[in-house]
């Protein structure tokens, strides 16, 4: 989905208006989605910085970062994972853990270690390209 970050931002705004004490994000059984959405979503909770490294088949490593210095929510955060939390959901959860931004609870994630990027062709055709992430 290409609107996850926008939708989560709206939810956060609603929760802030209610003066909640914290937010729980449930990623259980979430198979992932757009890598860019995972990066942008992470950016709602961190100031700026690297979110994920992508290693191409040629061995080149590319670091994907959040460049937006604003933090949309800096309160208490809890993320629920299970063995079906995969792909970009793992990236989001892992980034929050790496930044000590929230408490990550539940089971170990799927451990997919890859994401798919779609190359859009003329018309409505798309080709999924897998990349290794770390």
Give each language-model segment a name.
Residues 1-125:
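Cleft-lining beta-strand/loop regions that shape enzyme active-site pockets
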Residues 125-134:
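C-terminal "exit" segments of structured domains
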């Amino acid at each position: 989905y290409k609107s996850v970050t926008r939708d989560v931002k709206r939810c956060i705004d609603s929760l802030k208006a209610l003066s909640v004490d914290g937010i729980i994000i449930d990623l259980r059984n979430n198979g992932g989605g757009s890598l860019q959405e995972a990066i942008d979503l992470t950016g709602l909770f961190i100031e700026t910085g690297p979110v994920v490294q992508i290693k191409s088949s040629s061995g080149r490593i590319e670091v994907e970062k959040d460049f937006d210095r604003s933090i949309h929510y800096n309160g208490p955060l809890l993320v629920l994972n299970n063995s079906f939390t995969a792909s970009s959901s793992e990236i989001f959860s892992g980034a929050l853990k790496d930044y000590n931004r929230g408490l990550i609870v539940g089971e170990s994630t799927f451990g997919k270690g890859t994401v798919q990027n779609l190359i859009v062709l003329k018309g409505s055709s798309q080709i999924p390209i897998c990349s290794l992430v770390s």
